[in-house]
Amino acid sequence: SAVYKVKLIGPDGQENEFDVPDDQYILDAAEEAGVDLPYSCRAGACSTCAGKIEKGQVDQSDGSFLEDHHFEKGYVLTCVAYPQSDLVIHTHKEEELF
């Protein structure tokens, strides 16, 4: 399987970069890397873990909460997102969804 570099940018501009294999959810990999991210259901059925993709592609077909218009703007549920390329994601974006 492939491994991609994922950079997360938090609300205060802090950056964390770590490797994520293409069969691991970004949230799980972030926790393993010691990065503290918001989450609730861990099943893609709420919006607590939402982020916004600045660069790159994910597979988040396991999620159910976001709709097409969210995907078109780059929003991502990190708890059900597999990386499909190197990524830059801004985290803590739940309040922007509504």
Curated annotation (Swiss-Prot):
Indicate yes or no for the key word S-adenosyl-L-methionine.
no
Determine the domain of life of the protein's source: Eukaryota
Free-text cofactor note:
Binds 1 [2Fe-2S] cluster.
Q: Where, by residue number, does [2Fe-2S] cluster bind?
A: C41, C46, C49, C79
User: InterPro entries this protein is in?
Assistant: 2Fe-2S_ferredoxin-like_sf, 2Fe-2S_ferredoxin-type, 2Fe2S_fd_BS, Beta-grasp_dom_sf, Fd_pln
Where in or outside the cell it occurs: the entry states: Plastid, Chloroplast
Domain 2Fe-2S ferredoxin-type, chain residue ranges per copy: 4-95
UniProt keyword annotation of Methyltransferase present: no
| Any one cellular-component term (Gene Ontology) | chloroplast
A single GO molecular-function term is: 2 iron, 2 sulfur cluster binding
Which keywords describe this protein according to UniProt?
2Fe-2S, Chloroplast, Electron transport, Iron, Iron-sulfur, Metal-binding, Plastid, Transport
Tell me the cofactors it needs: [2Fe-2S] cluster
Q: Name one GO biological process term.
A: electron transport chain
Q: What intrachain disulfides are recorded?
A: none
- Chief localisation class: plastid
Give the misc comment: In radish there are 4 ferredoxins: 2 are root-specific (R-B1 and R-B2), one is present in both leaves and roots (L-A), and there is a minor form which is leaf specific (L-B).
Q: What does this protein do?
A: Ferredoxins are iron-sulfur proteins that transfer electrons in a wide variety of metabolic reactions.
**Entry's family note:** Belongs to the 2Fe2S plant-type ferredoxin family.
Cited PANTHER family:
FERREDOXIN, FERREDOXIN-3, CHLOROPLASTIC
**Stated name of the protein:** Ferredoxin, root R-B1
Q: Which organism is it from?
A: Raphanus sativus
